[in-house]
Amino acid sequence: MTNLNLVQKYGPWVTVTGASSGIGRAFALKLARQGFNVHITGRNQQSLADLKEQLKEQTQILIHTTIADLSTDDGIERLINDANTLDVGLLVHAAGAESHGAFNDGDINQELSLLDLNIRSTYRLAHHFSEKFVSRGKGGILLVSSLTGHFHSPYFANYASSKSYVLTLGNSLHHELKSKGVDVSVLSPGLTYTPMYENIAKDIDWSKTPMKASSPEFVVEYALKSFPRKVNIIPGTGNRISAVFGQRILPRFFGKQNESLFRKAMKAH
């Protein structure tokens, strides 16, 4: 299946969360070029306005914008209400928050807000859109998890655990909804050049790790070539190998190695 078939399969509208920057923004641009009308959502009003102008310059598609903080119930309701005015057939849920560092040093309120965004919004949106798609007899859901969600990730404990939820939910819904015409897959990117990467780089020296970052465009290109054929989509050969070893073959050893690796890579402040 090529990207062009996705509009015919699900179309005409796609809702993309986290479209202000990074992977979400790259999804919005790519899917618009493939012919989808795009419903872009995010917290940064100026970034979404800039994206809307770029989409207008490069495509002839329709664009709908929702400014919403998906870590709040009000933000989720605003997105859902706007999406209900459109014939959305595909959801790409790329919004997410990241945290890192020693578990006991984390700010509790920030960590709980992370869980609201990464877990609560994922549940709410997956529930709403899957119900809508089952009713219309077709639809697609692509949830964005993380490579860290596939294995033990010391110093990323809360973030990785939240992404494990996304991974498990997506895989479970894949099997549950397939017979009802709804495709569900999970994208688990490794290290990617996004604002999230820049935030982590303030505290972690990536040169002391074997991890190599990919561009958001590479991640999105691979994802759309794989969706919906693959349930678990992991861009990058090295990342796929890491997921297999960390999740299935040597999980405890992998976790121990990650603890040593990131403890040494953490910058002193």
Segment roles from a protein language model:
Residues 13, 18-22:
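Conserved glycine-rich cofactor-binding loop
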Residues 34-50:
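Conserved glycine-rich Rossmann-like NAD(P)H-binding loop of the short-chain dehydrogenase/reductase
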Residues 102-115:
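Substrate-binding pocket helix/loop in short-chain dehydrogenase/reductase
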Residues 186, 207-243:
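C-terminal helical subdomain
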Residues 94-99:
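Conserved NAD(P)H cofactor-binding loop of Rossmann-fold oxidoreductase domains
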Residues 126, 162:
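Active-site helix of classical SDR
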